[in-house]
């Protein structure tokens, strides 16, 4: 069977599934392997009963895609895929690059955040926040102001010789229809990837940075009804913006809340000590 090599989130990935959106890599010893196979027997009943996810702490995890395809991630180094009878390949590859690789990194004890990563020319900045907070809107505006593109939606952070680094993911940005139209990109030049969520993909080789960057700032975006803001809106017709620097326990709580699968791990297994150490290093290095 054909084997493909890619550089994804800074890791050499060997895969039996092609990823047209990823950066090709020379063949060599892989840090992550993606291949076809059967699910472990212990998970057969879960799939038959209609369950969608299962985790075994930070050791292994399983999830089922809406087309019936199943994915098993173990040891921070292997992803096994069992295709359904009618696989939706664009959805499968998208989830392998997000959820699949997120589980790999968390199992490796590395922080993996929800958010976008951009490059200022000197350092990486992360844009985090809940769905609807404006991450994509702010990221698109900054990209139009000539910042570099590192990652869209999910970001791997890990220790480097000079400090904590944000790794590039792959040169593709996901857009909803409204955002694509707002930035003036013709829809026919984009790739339609998700009918249910009306999502498009934009290949961003034009501004993609292939090397990791030292993490500088993390911005948590949110929409709040804060006392005094309503008056500003009524008086000026514009929304007021407030910024606050977080330190200490609040900074750590904020970082942990932005981890991929944060709620699952906070309320079941808890965040393991090695991963918490990485969060402490990030809080000490980056302004939040």
Whereabouts are the PLM-identified features?
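Extreme N-terminal, non-catalytic leader segments
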Residues: 62-69, 73-123, 184
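Generic structural signal for well-ordered secondary structure
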Residues: 56, 93-94, 248
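Conserved lysine of the Walker
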Residues: 135
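Short, solvent-exposed cationic patches
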Residues: 37, 106, 148
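Post-Walker A alpha-helix
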Residues: 138-139
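Short Pro/Gly-enriched beta-strand edge/turn motifs at strand-loop
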Residues: 54-55, 97-101, 199
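Long, basic/Gly/Ser/Thr-rich N-terminal segments
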Residues: 1-88, 280-288
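Glycine-rich, often acidic-flanked micro-motifs
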Residues: 2-18, 22-23, 120-130, 144-288
């Amino acid at each position: 069977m054909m084997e493909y090599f890619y550089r994804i989130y800074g890791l050499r990935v060997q895969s039996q599934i092609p990823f047209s959106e990823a950066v090709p890599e020379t063949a060599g010893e892989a840090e992550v392997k993606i291949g076809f196979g059967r699910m472990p027997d212990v998970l057969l009943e879960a799939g038959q009963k209609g369950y969608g996810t299962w985790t075994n702490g930070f050791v292994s995890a399983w999830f089922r895609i809406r087309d019936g395809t199943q994915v098993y991630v173990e040891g921070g180094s292997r992803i096994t895929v069992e295709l359904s009878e009618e696989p939706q390949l664009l959805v499968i590859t998208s989830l392998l690059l997000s959820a699949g690789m997120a589980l790999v990194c968390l199992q490796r004890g590395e922080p993996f955040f929800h958010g976008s990563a951009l490059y200022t020319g000197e350092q990486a900045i992360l844009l985090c926040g809940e769905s609807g907070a404006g991450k994509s809107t702010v990221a698109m505006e900054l990209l139009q102001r000539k910042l570099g593109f590192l990652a869209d939606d999910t970001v791997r952070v890990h220790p480097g010789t000079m400090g904590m680094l944000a790794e590039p993911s792959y040169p593709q940005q996901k857009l909803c229809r409204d955002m694509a139209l707002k930035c003036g990109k013709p829809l026919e030049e984009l790739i339609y990837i998700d009918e249910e969520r009306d999502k498009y993909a934009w290949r961003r080789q034009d501004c993609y940075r292939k090397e990791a960057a030292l993490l500088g700032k993390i911005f948590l975006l949110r929409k709040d009804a804060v006392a005094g803001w309503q008056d500003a809106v009524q008086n000026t017709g514009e929304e007021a913006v407030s910024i606050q620097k977080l330190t200490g326990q609040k900074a750590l709580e904020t970082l942990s809340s932005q981890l991929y699968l944060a709620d699952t791990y906070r309320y079941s297994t808890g965040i393991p000590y090695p991963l918490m150490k990485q969060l402490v290093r990030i809080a000490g290095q980056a302004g939040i």
